[in-house]
UniProtKB/Swiss-Prot annotation:
Single annotated GO MF: protein-macromolecule adaptor activity
Record's keyword terms, sorted: Cell cycle, Cell division, Chromosome, Chromosome partition, Cytoplasm, Cytoskeleton, Meiosis, Telomere
Localization of this protein: Cytoplasm, Cytoskeleton, Microtubule organizing center, Spindle pole body; Chromosome, Telomere
Subunit structure: Interacts with bqt2 and sad1. The bqt1-bqt2-sad1 complex binds rap1.
Gene Ontology CC, one term: meiotic spindle pole body
Organism: Schizosaccharomyces pombe (strain 972 / ATCC 24843)
Name of this protein: Telomere bouquet protein 1
Entry keyword annotation includes Cytoplasm: yes
Gene this chain is encoded by: bqt1
Length: 132
């Protein structure tokens, strides 16, 4: 498993802004040089697909970490969803795991009208594994 990228994302759920982290891993190494156009495109595409899917999963399971604990029965990584992208034949596996790291400087975000909105840190973070 090879780390491709990691990023923090915010999303709205029930009029509350949440913060979580996603990390995308690939089966085989991918060029991480900033000049590598194909790798940049792959990262951007996978981040977009992942964000859309994660927002969808949160709409189905608002308390996804509690759901994962019930399914797994322990405080460790749980497979939540698996899908295959028809256009690329990539298989994507979505895992959640505990996110205990303290964050500083991410207490709020600025929304479109310029006001600051508080962020609530989720209990879980995401690991997406991409099989080529």
């Amino acid at each position: 498993m090879h780390l491709l990228t990691t990023t923090l994302i915010s999303f709205e759920q029930n009029k509350v802004e949440y913060l979580t982290q996603i990390a995308i891993y690939t089966q085989t190494p991918v060029c991480t040089d900033s000049n590598c156009e194909h790798a940049r495109f792959l990262k951007h595409s996978l981040i977009q697909v992942s964000i859309e899917r994660i927002e969808y999963l949160y709409s189905i399971f608002p308390n996804i970490w509690q759901f994962a604990l019930l399914c797994q029965g322990q405080n460790k990584e749980s497979l939540i969803h698996m899908e295959e992208d028809a256009s690329t034949n990539f298989k994507l596996r979505y895992y959640v795991l505990p996110w205990s790291r303290r964050l500083q400087g991410y207490q709020s975000i600025t929304v479109q009208n310029g006001s600051h909105v508080p962020l609530v840190k989720r209990l879980e973070k995401w690991r997406i594994f991409v099989e080529c």
